[in-house]
Amino acid sequence: MPTSRRALAGGALSMHVAYFLAISCLGYGLLGVLKVREPGAAPRRIDRFFTAVSAATVSSMSTVEMEVFSNGQLVVLTVLMLLGGEVFVSLVGLASKWSKLRSDAMDRSRRVESHGDVALADIDGGDVENPTSSGEEAASRRRPMDADTLRHNAVRALFYIVLAIFAVVHVVGAVAVAAYVLASPGARRTLGDKSLNTWTFAVFTTVSTFSNCGFMPTNENMVVFKRDAPLQLLLVPQVLAGNTLFAPLLAACVWAAAAATRREELVEMAREGGRAAAAGYAHLMPARRCWMLAATVAAFVAVLMALVCGMEWGGALQGMSPWEKVVNALFLAVNARHTGESTVDLSILAPAILVLFVLMMYLPPYTTWFPFEENSTTKDSNAENQGIRLLESTLLSQLSYLTIFVIAICITERRKLKEDPLNFSVLSIVVEVVSAYGNVGFSMGYSCSRQINPDHLCTDKWTGFVGRWSDSGKLILIFVMFFGRLKKFSMKGGKAWKLS
């Protein structure tokens, strides 16, 4: 059994790797075929591939300015973000599981029919001495069928619920963003100055926000909308619904559907430990875990908001009204986990805030303060899993991998670390690497004014810090983005290493 489970886990990892590589390569090809806005500003090949990987892994790390891309290329990036988002990927997994369960049910049905033909032949032969015994045998054959049918129906119902959430958030979100832009002269003027279509902006922004990518079709990300508090408040629920609070939202929808229909599979999923009925869908959690998760998210956001307001009220937030400052602090706090849309230049934030951002970017979305003993349906402690846990424990921890990545970047960029220490600081590299690992997209950027030996040919660009790295450094960060997108397969590593 452990061998088969390890093979299953390895197969899932291989499928995920193949999926993200395929859509990244497809995006790279399409971005190369389609024309950019200005022919002379076409990105280099490695920058095109970097952008495609960044969109597919919903990382929003950037090496080129977003306004370089034409409307057609923005559509390609929108599709990549849609396909790479966690909710969509889990939806594909549910569809695959539903198809497999339906196929298994059809196979069982054919076997039962063949057994029924044999039993009918036995009855015709006169073997009717113990009808009670044969009835019990038939009932025992039906009981597993009932459990399998319940599981099949649960997966099917869950697929439709997740699909409904996915569709409603995108439709309502895009319409709401477009309505705000059309109603706001300032926002409409901003898009007009950048030659951006309102609906392209609305759809792109909604997909990017719900998938927790963080790309915006503007060079400055959300900095140009830092005075548009209503727009930020429209995006905050989309950020939460697509990431840290997706599990509580899903649980609430399952509970509402169960209360409205009283269908057996929905009632089973709504119960504590209903993940078993839903074939272990990772985003379906018991009610108590959902409540604690929501409380943890609220606490993290409150701490981040308090620190940003306390340290940047007269700094990075200067020039805004008190209401706008509070909303901007909320927007930054929510986006630190893990969307990466920003309304301020992160390089001017206090180091204490940046360190806390690094911690928030490192933590998984469902990090929860949960001081309760897990029950048997939640805790994975079966004897058959010992082999899997032994294999996982021999791997390095996530912090060890991040340390290796930071060291590798420091080696590839060692010359710039010496010549341009204010821009190429270790903190800037750590922020960039952890942001790529967490698929966030926060970056401290690069400023020509911080150069110790000014280069008169240097021009400031609205790109991430990685845009100034060597090709070797960019390739390492591409690997980090893939690794971060697939980190759920290695989260339990490093347990064999004892520090005391």
UniProtKB/Swiss-Prot annotation:
One of its GO terms (biological process) is metal ion transport. Residues 1-12, 95-156, 260-290, 367-390, 485-500 are cytoplasmic. GO terms for cellular component: plasma membrane. Coiled coil: none annotated. It is found in: Membrane. InterPro entries: Cat_transpt, TrkH_K-transport. It is a multi-pass membrane protein. Pfam families: TrkH. Residues 121-145 are annotated as: Disordered. The keyword DNA repair does not apply. Keywords: Ion transport, Membrane, Transmembrane, Transmembrane helix, Transport. Its main location: membrane. The keyword Transmembrane applies. The chain crosses the membrane at residues 13-33, 74-94, 157-177, 239-259, 291-311, 346-366, 391-411, 464-484. Belongs to the TrkH potassium transport family. HKT (TC 2.A.38.3) subfamily. HKT transporters are proposed to contain 4 pore-forming regions enclosed by transmembrane segments with each containing a potassium channel-like selectivity filter motif. Probable cation transporter. May be involved in regulation of potassium-sodium homeostasis. This is Probable cation transporter HKT1;4. The lineage of its organism: Eukaryota, Viridiplantae, Streptophyta, Embryophyta, Tracheophyta. The gene is HKT1;4.
